[in-house]
């Protein structure tokens, strides 16, 4: 039976030259990351692999250049300087293709650092708000180190992992990282109203993160029977669900359900997701598969872009 151990003991499983996966976005396991970075002087050539992550990424600090090198599929705020300085590499790849890199051994993983809910009475933990590529990583990595946190929502879908699969567990009661909704400007609200006018009743929405997708969601109050099939989602969907605007009833794939790979938002969002059968957190290879997406009606993608 897998047992709980201190972070330092769990991260002693990481050796020089290993490839280590870090879970995505707000599920990035900060205690495990900190314990790994504490061992920087003992390690050389550890490759860190991840998508977008929130929070600290101290392994790419200049003083750890010989110990760690990051290979990232998304360049977020905590990776930009490192990529520009050569302490991290950007791997251009569609997110839907990343699970295949793990499963086919193209990018084999030695260790996966995960952030999960406590096990249920059957021994299953949940990847919670970040299933996306974490499902494939947890299937393929030789060593799974899990930060077990009662604040992690237990979500329905592909994110269940039995404790027998975990190599080491670390207890944690830290608040999850949050991305709080920001007040929208008059211009953003105007853009949101314009885009919302292009969305048809019964449409299936995909939306990104940022002010414009948030502004569009805020302007959908008069719509009906909307559905969600999206890589990620945030707080903007909650009110629309509670007001009966997002129902998913017109969707052909998982009708009635919100389908996503990961979520980033406030504590309110995480509580909304907890044990909510309406929300299906699924493997991103499936969520972002165009053959799946096109089966839904009136698919409408809402994202931000740089001019």
Language-model-detected regions and their locations in the chain:
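Conserved alpha/beta enzyme-core scaffold
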Residues: 1-307
């Amino acid at each position: 039976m897998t047992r709980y151990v201190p972070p330092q003991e769990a991260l002693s499983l990481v050796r020089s030259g290993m490839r280590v996966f870090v879970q995505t976005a707000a599920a990035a396991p900060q205690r495990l990351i900190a314990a790994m970075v504490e061992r920087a002087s003992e390690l050389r050539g550890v490759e860190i692999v991840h998508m977008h992550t929130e929070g600290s990424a101290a392994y790419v600090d200049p003083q750890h250049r010989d110990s760690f090198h990051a290979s990232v599929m998304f360049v977020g705020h905590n990776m930009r300087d490192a990529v520009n300085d050569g302490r991290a590499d950007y791997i251009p790849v569609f997110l839907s293709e990343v699970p295949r890199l793990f499963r086919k051994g193209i990018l084999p993983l030695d260790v996966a650092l995960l952030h999960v809910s406590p096990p249920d009475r059957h021994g299953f933990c949940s990847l919670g708000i970040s299933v996306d590529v974490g499902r494939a990583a947890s299937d393929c990595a030789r060593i799974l180190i899990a930060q077990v946190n009662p604040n992690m929502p237990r979500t329905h879908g592909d994110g269940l992992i039995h404790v027998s699969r975990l190599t080491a567990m670390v207890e944690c009661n830290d608040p999850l990282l949050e991305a709080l909704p920001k007040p929208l400007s008059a211009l953003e609200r105007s853009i949101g109203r314009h885009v919302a006018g292009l969305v048809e009743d019964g449409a299936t929405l995909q939306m990104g993160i940022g002010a414009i997708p948030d502004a569009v969601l805020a302007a959908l109050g008069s719509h009906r029977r909307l559905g969600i099939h999206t890589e990620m989602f945030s707080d903007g969907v909650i009110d629309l669900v509670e007001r009966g605007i997002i129902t998913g009833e017109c969707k052909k794939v998982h009708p009635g359900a919100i389908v996503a790979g990961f979520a980033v938002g406030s504590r309110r969002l995480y509580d909304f997701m907890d044990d909510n059968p309406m929300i299906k957190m699924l493997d991103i290879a499936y969520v972002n598969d165009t053959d799946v997406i096109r089966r839904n009606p009136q698919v409408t993608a809402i994202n931000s872009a740089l001019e």
